[in-house]
Amino acid sequence: YGIRQVDKESTVIAVSMSGNVARTVEAVKEAQERGAYVVGITNSLTGRLYEVCSHPVFLGLEEEPGWTPGTLTYTGTLYALYCLGAGLSRESERDGCLRKLAFTMEQVSRIVTQCQDMARQAGENFVYNGHQFPVYILGAGQNFATAKYGAAKFLEVCGVIAIGQESEEFAHQEFWVIDKNCPVFLVAPKGDSFQRTMEVGECLRHFGCDLFVISNSEELCGMGKYAFRMPEEVEELYAPLLYAVPMQLTAYYFSRKLGLDPDRRSHNDPFRKKVSRMLTRGTVNLD
């Protein structure tokens, strides 16, 4: 529907790691026909997005590391988007944005190491504490998208239902069906979205839920059964680059505990993979 508002004054950014997601490629073609400036972010030189997009950006990322699909490409995509944002910012602010971005990226490997033991414990907790599902992941502002991404990791590699929701909306919707044995992740850097997410967390702890807290607030971390402490210096704006890591790792260890292969998603099911291609790449062949 948004394509109707695109014209020659518009800038459109398309993202597809394979470069072959049919709807993304269609949107790029339509936007370019309407005269828009289109940037395509992809990790494939042979995909259709790189071929049809007037301004492709190739990430050039190597093969994924051996834990949880879509971790390296997700971080790489976010980094590219932040770089684009910095490039579009006021010249007086650009250098400061790029310095903060570089500092945050330098923290990624440290956070991966720092979160390993806690993520392993959290993943095992799902099994030994008899948790019910779905897994709920709550965030607000920029970190609503982080919550949605975290839910995707549990869906893809653990085969359990997971729901990423905006913190306020959760209070009006999913809360009415949540079981106190459902695990809840709170993605909550200090900033504009923090206070409401913390209030929701306090209520859920009172309700009896186990909280898995990802935050740079000691007060909120103190409320969690499991707490992933994030760097104080990283601002809310840049938090998505780091705050996805604990969920990636927890999903990885939970998947292994279930006896699954976290490196494979559900692609080891040939029929499911076939239908997935029908859904996303326009290959509708029912034979």
Feature-to-residue mapping (PLM):
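Glycine-rich phosphate-binding loops that contact phosphosugars or nucleotide phosphates
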Residues: 1-104, 140, 176, 181-183, ...
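Alpha-helix N-cap/helix-start and coil->helix boundary motif
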Residues: 46, 143-144, 247
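Active-site phosphate/pyrophosphate-binding segments
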Residues: 55-183, 258-287
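A conserved, hydrophobic alpha-helical segment in the catalytic core
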Residues: 77-87, 241-252
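Extended hydrophobic-aromatic, low-complexity segments
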Residues: 145-149, 162-164, 173-174, 194-198, ...
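Composition- and surface-driven signal marking solvent-exposed, interaction-prone regions
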Residues: 150, 198-200, 243, 266-267
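Structured C-terminal subdomain patch of bacterial secreted/periplasmic proteins
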Residues: 222-248, 254-255
